Amino acid sequence: MSKENKTTDFGFTEVPWEEKQKKVAGVFHSVAAKYDLMNDLMSFGIHRIWKKQTIAKTGVRKGDKVLDLAGGTGDLAYKFCQMVGSQGKVVLSDINSSMLEVGKEKLTNKGCVGNIEYVQANAECLPFPDNYFDCITISFGLRNVTDKAKALASMCRVLKPGGRLLVLEFSKPIVPMLSKVYDEYSFKALPFLGKIITQDAESYKYLAESIRKHPDQETLKQMMYDAGFDNVEYQNMTGGIVALHIGYKY
């Protein structure tokens, strides 16, 4: 089937392959200004713990080059700037210009200058040299990518041998009772919060649906192996609501 005839998921809706990127862009242009506030409200602040645990697993050191992909408003990039020091470099990359602008303003106001670059880029075709980064992170962004396999292969290409990729993403709860509560919260509370805070219930309806369409823990693990990563492992967080996958390039 040619790409012109292919379809893919946008939440629970099937859309033409080339249309998903535009629709996802619309979501994040809409929510960028209130993105951080909504993250705190939706997760009761727990997203900060998930990200802190992710950063602790990166192994980032002084002088490293780090790519924070789909980095949005820069929660991880800010910490990486401190970790790599003046001799290192952090690239905060996002496909969405609104998110990137919010991230740049936020990090500049926090004094993160000199060792950070901002690059608008598509994860499926990263504009960086082969074997360039010591570490790549993508936090709550992979599920929005149209061609996830292509994006993972692109990440593998730009990662140095010996480097690691960390994928922090919503996943499949492993506790049945938690799964039921989570479904109720996702499909009812999230759109309601979105309507009250951002005047955009539909974007948060998409959020809940996109989580359900994202590959589960074992499927994503295999996708990372298929993309060229080795020693792939994952850690469930908060009962599997979120999972952190780590893969290495040798």
Swiss-Prot record:
NCBIfam families: MenG_MenH_UbiE (TIGR01934), PRK00216.1-1 (NF001240), PRK00216.1-3 (NF001242), PRK00216.1-5 (NF001244). Belongs to the class I-like SAM-binding methyltransferase superfamily. MenG/UbiE family. Methyltransferase required for the conversion of demethylmenaquinol (DMKH2) to menaquinol (MKH2) and the conversion of 2-polyprenyl-6-methoxy-1,4-benzoquinol (DDMQH2) to 2-polyprenyl-3-methyl-6-methoxy-1,4-benzoquinol (DMQH2). S-adenosyl-L-methionine binds at T73, D94, N122, A123, S139. SUPFAM superfamilies: S-adenosyl-L-methionine-dependent methyltransferases. This is Ubiquinone/menaquinone biosynthesis C-methyltransferase UbiE. The lineage of its organism: Bacteria, Pseudomonadati, Pseudomonadota, Gammaproteobacteria, Thiotrichales. It catalyses: a 2-demethylmenaquinol + S-adenosyl-L-methionine = a menaquinol + S-adenosyl-L-homocysteine + H(+); a 2-methoxy-6-(all-trans-polyprenyl)benzene-1,4-diol + S-adenosyl-L-methionine = a 5-methoxy-2-methyl-3-(all-trans-polyprenyl)benzene-1,4-diol + S-adenosyl-L-homocysteine + H(+). GO terms for molecular function: 2-methoxy-6-polyprenyl-1,4-benzoquinol methyltransferase activity; demethylmenaquinone methyltransferase activity. Pfam families: Ubie_methyltran. CDD domains: AdoMet_MTases (cd02440). It comes from Francisella philomiragia subsp. philomiragia (strain ATCC 25017 / CCUG 19701 / FSC 153 / O#319-036).
